[in-house]
UniProtKB/Swiss-Prot annotation:
Family stated for the protein in its record: Belongs to the eukaryotic ribosomal protein eL8 family.
GO cellular component: cytoplasm; ribonucleoprotein complex; ribosome
Assembly behavior: Part of the 50S ribosomal subunit. Probably part of the RNase P complex.
Record InterPro entries: eL8/uL1-like (IPR050257), Ribosomal_eL30-like_sf (IPR029064), Ribosomal_eL8-like_CS (IPR004037), Ribosomal_eL8/eL30/eS12/Gad45 (IPR004038), Ribosomal_eL8/Nhp2 (IPR018492), Ribosomal_eL8_arc (IPR022481)
HAMAP family linked to this entry: Ribosomal_eL8
Domain of life, source organism: Archaea
Name of the molecule in the record: Large ribosomal subunit protein eL8
Gene Ontology terms describing biological process: ribosome biogenesis; translation; tRNA 5'-leader removal
Amino acid sequence: MSKPIYVRFEVPEDLAEKAYEAVKRARETGRIKKGTNETTKAVERGLAKLVVIAEDVDPPEIVMHLPLLCDEKKIPYVYVPSKKRLGEAAGIEVAAASVAIIEPGDAETLVREIVEKVKELRAKAGV
């Protein structure tokens, strides 16, 4: 299956796993915003340190604005394959189309690693 239109670069599986782990740790020891509405507000206000966007969102219009908004606000973002797993990592019983890490807590090093890797991936993809 091809990637949705809002996915601008390919994220390797190991990096996606780190993103799930970062969300989980930030939820336990820092602060996160769950869901597209809260994530959008956090990005618009410049509070997000990292935005995690699920690739299996249907309809894609739900999260289509996030990569552009993140670029505009200079906030890094990464994709993960599953909204269900993203919801679990965020500590909710339903799927989450996106999550914003506001305060990484114990995930600070992990978030930094993800941001650096995303910079490399985006440079390779030319976005």
